[in-house]
Amino acid sequence: MNINTNGRHLTKFKEFVYPEIYDLKSPKILEFGVSAAAMSTEILLDLCERNNGKLYSVDINDFSSKFNSKNWIFIHRRDDDYNFINTLLPSKLDFIYLDTIHKADHVEKILFKYFHLLKVNCNFVIDDTSWLPYTKNREKNHFFMEVNNYETFFRLIKIYNSNFEKMNLEFSFLGTGAAKITKLSEKELIKPCEINNRFYSFKNLLRLIYDFFILKIKKFND
């Protein structure tokens, strides 16, 4: 395969994703989102061909002619068409990669629909979770992508906080970012709830007032 070795997206994939999967034996991999470039598909398929695995790629656009390999099954469907997709998948998967609709509600839906298929100690990776490159005056500078990725980032933190005994969560900020969830348990995930933080508590207000006056006193004494 002729994989393009340029770009931060590839660097992110090689450094944050690939080390988790490169030595999997006979891996069963589910990928949501192919795209015209098909970079992740090419890398994952190369792995499956070398390690006697199977790659299941799902996309609403027809990329079925992109590759010709006995190790690849293309599923021409929406990623949330679970009833159909599930009939083509094995009972358990070694890796899931999501790169389709980058909105918090959709990411949560796909995670909850397919997470139970993942083997324990295996990974579910979600691409595009950093809003920073899309902020004003940054290289991508895009309002909707900034907001979508911001909401997705914090939604994943809420999901983790509600399920911290069932998963680990890591983030990469290379390129447009990615989240890596490691499954720790076969227990069913529960829906996220608000985090009971104390940012807006009366105690924190007193802390801020105290810090403000301490700073004023220090400046006055200087």
Regions found by a protein language model. Give the residues of each.
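A short alpha-helical cap/connector motif
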Residues: 1-97, 101-222
